[in-house]
Amino acid sequence: MKKMPEKHDLLTAMMAAKEQGIGAILAFAMAYLRGRYNGGAFKKTLIDATMCAIIAWFIRDLLVFAGLSSNLAYIASVFIGYIGTDSIGSLIKRFAAKKAGVDDANQQ
């Protein structure tokens, strides 16, 4: 009996997700380095970097959806890591408020 009969299927699945994984690693590294450089606490920096990696995992699909080249995924992943989840969240809130027609001066 083989030790790991599903090894080839596992390797195939890992190779299929290689591009997304590289983008996630780039975003994680950039967010972690940015957070530590700015003097952030280790735990907060690690959580922010993980959230950036999750967002960057799907950036290739978002670029294709937007009609842009998927070759921009690596630089977009680094950009995601650089701006961080706080900036991404505020951009999404601003976009949603504009679409909903909300004009509140107290929005950040």
UniProtKB/Swiss-Prot annotation:
One of its GO terms (biological process) is killing of cells of another organism. The keyword Methyltransferase does not apply. InterPro entries: Phage_lambda_GpS_holin. It is found in: Host cell inner membrane. It comes from the Viruses. It is a multi-pass membrane protein. Induction: Expressed in the late phase of the viral replicative cycle. Keywords: Cytolysis, Formylation, Host cell inner membrane, Host cell lysis by virus, Host cell membrane, Host membrane, Late protein, Membrane, Transmembrane, Transmembrane helix, Viral release from host cell. The chain crosses the membrane at residues 39-59, 72-92. Its main location: host cell. Residues 1-38, 93-108 are cytoplasmic. GO terms for cellular component: host cell plasma membrane; membrane. Residues 60-71 are periplasmic. The keyword Transmembrane applies. The C-terminus acts as a cytoplasmic regulatory region. Belongs to the lambdavirus holin family. This is Antiholin.
